[in-house]
Structures are given as C-alpha cells and as structure tokens.
Amino acid sequence: MELPSENFQCKKMNTLIFATNNENKVIEIRSLLDDNFQILSLAEAGINIDIPEPFDTLEENAIEKSEVIYKLAKTDCFAEDTGLEVKALHNEPGVKSARYAGEERDFDKNVAKLLANLKNNTDRFARFRTVICLTINGTHNIFDGECKGTIIAERKGSGGFGYDCVFVPEGSSKTFAEMSLQEKNKYSHRKKATQKLISYLKTLKKQ
C-alpha cells in the first residue's frame, strides 16, 4: 500500500477522490459531472491500495471503501459499490458481481458463469444497483440508483464493461455494450445515484 504524497492536497469542496481502481467507473462518473467538479481516481491521488469488500450489502461495502480512503487521505471522498441482481438466481451475483467466477475478477468468466446458470431459464429479469457513499468531514451520506432490465442468452456489443454485453435495460432493445456512453447514461443506475450525489453537493456549495 502506498500513502498519498506529502504534497497532495484535495481540500476544495468541488474536488473529490473517487475510491476506486476501476478506470471504467471513473470515466462513467466523469461523463456525468460538469466542470464544477473535479474527480481524482486513487492513482491520480497517489494512492495505491486494493480496498476489500467484505460485507454482504452494497451499502456496507461502499461505506467501508469511502471510510478507508477518508482516513488515509484525510480529505473528502466517495466510493461506490455496484451489483447485478438476477431474480431467478436469488439476486446473485449481487455484491459478488466482480468476483462471481473467482477472486481474479475476470468478467469474461463472470459472464460465462451467469449465462450458464441461467441456461433454459425463462425468467431473465435483472437489475443493476449502485450505492454511493460520500464522506465529508467524517460523515457518510448514501445515494442509490437502479436500472431494471433483462439478461439475454448471448453476448452482444463490444462497448462498456462487466455484464454490459448481456444486459438490456427496460425501454431499449440494445445491451449496454451496444450503446454509446451517452446512450447508456439515459438508463444507467450509476447515473441515477450520481445525480443524487451531485444534487447534494450543490446544496452544500450554497451553504
């Protein structure tokens, strides 16, 4: 684990560390924010750490990740945890979405396992859920968002990441992986949670 450099500063309300090593998530979050907010990834903040996700709920994992970075960097930050919940699989993979097929976080294997477990199952309903924890002055604030949809039988599309290639959101005939980032943001669970985060940050700036 590497600590933030001594000259690292992130004290402005509109500059926040995003407690993730997932560059795809950083790109999505940045696409949802305007120029009034600056988001730093862990790497950009000089922090090299793999934060554990030991809990059974998205909320607890988001809080844990945000709290770890807040204590480490001594500055405001936020974290998110996202899970795919499939009704026919009793809401699996859920909090284990990134490690569904093993600790190596291989999403090709994760998708293959998901499709195998759903083989011949006619109930394909699923939803993505995102929970964001914003930590300011040691206080945690929770924001969530969800996107309902369907798991298709075969992968489609080359964009996105994770389970995007097999998830079709309600109201669309495309998988997330077939959409541009702008299209995906029309449905995105992450966008819905991020919009709540932004609204809260704007109220703080007015105070």
What are these regions (language model features)?
Residues 14-17, 23-207:
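Anionic-ligand binding patches
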